[in-house]
Amino acid sequence: MAFNLRNRNFLKLLDFSTKEIQFLIDLSADLKKAKYAGTEQKKLLGKNIALIFEKASTRTRCAFEVAAFDQGAQVTYIGPSGSQIGDKESMKDTARVLGRMYDGIQYRGFGQAIVEELGAFAGVPVWNGLTDEFHPTQILADFLTMLEHSQGKALADIQFAYLGDARNNVGNSLMVGAAKMGMDIRLVGPQAYWPDEELVAACQAIAKQTGGKITLTENVAEGVQGCDFLYTDVWVSMGESPEAWDERVALMKPYQVNMNVLKQTGNPNVKFMHCLPAFHNDETTIGKQVADKFGMKGLEVTEEVFESEHSIVFDEAENRMHTIKAVMVATLGS
């Protein structure tokens, strides 16, 4: 390997250099090709991996499980009701127990401080599957997907906008990733929902070194002009109360990704991205409740955009598995 990431935690992109992030993306692409070609080599044979989920998941759980199985590892799923973490046992103690039994641990849950403590005391690689502050494995998948749909452009040549709630874990992580990779990112949404000022300042300092550009704006037309990709996420994140919907929908409605917004990019080949799940119609319980209450079929993105040729959301979802596999192989593989 060009970089030795063995035994490293993967907790947030701030911990990794530009070259290390690019290495993980390149490794993801190689592993994806090998899986499709049937030439994959098992680098995790004999490894045991714990998957701690304090929040529900579809893509992240499936991606970790399939990636581990492909590479020859065994997994144990520990769900929200399947452990004593934080109730009868501290994370510090849990980390030291699981670290004696497992070769690697994934955590998906709440505060970043929790996964940082797990990483500090486990003694084995710990991977962040999502916290309230950061979602680093998602961003690796996003950047691999962008490269696959950029006609040979490097990441540093890509312009993209994130619309909506830019202070959530995906908005934060996209900003960090873009800064690290020297990209042009525009965070487009109400100022009250921009990322924390300290994180913005840290990313601006990184971007100054890498040649990246970070723009925060409430102006949709200004934010999306010339973009190669438009990205959005749900307006109310996991763990937030249903009461948050009324205020949030009123604030975020101008930042819905619809065909008019795509046209404002001036790029007929612009692509649409979303980390999923998405509220793009009324075919889910929550989607129907929203449609009935607000008269909107689709919130952060319209059905027309989601199902259009511009949408690459399922390529993006698949790439969760390839990039997670790369993280595990790089940090734990033989």
Swiss-Prot record:
One of its GO terms (molecular function) is ornithine carbamoyltransferase activity. Gene3D superfamilies: Aspartate/ornithine carbamoyltransferase. Carbamoyl phosphate binds at residues 57-60, 84, 108, 135-138, 275-276, 320. GO terms for biological process: arginine biosynthetic process via ornithine; citrulline biosynthetic process; L-arginine biosynthetic process. Pathway: Amino-acid biosynthesis; L-arginine biosynthesis; L-arginine from L-ornithine and carbamoyl phosphate: step 1/3. PANTHER family: ORNITHINE CARBAMOYLTRANSFERASE (PTHR45753:SF2), ORNITHINE CARBAMOYLTRANSFERASE, MITOCHONDRIAL (PTHR45753). Reversibly catalyzes the transfer of the carbamoyl group from carbamoyl phosphate (CP) to the N(epsilon) atom of ornithine (ORN) to produce L-citrulline. This is Ornithine carbamoyltransferase. It comes from Vibrio vulnificus (strain CMCP6). The gene is argF.
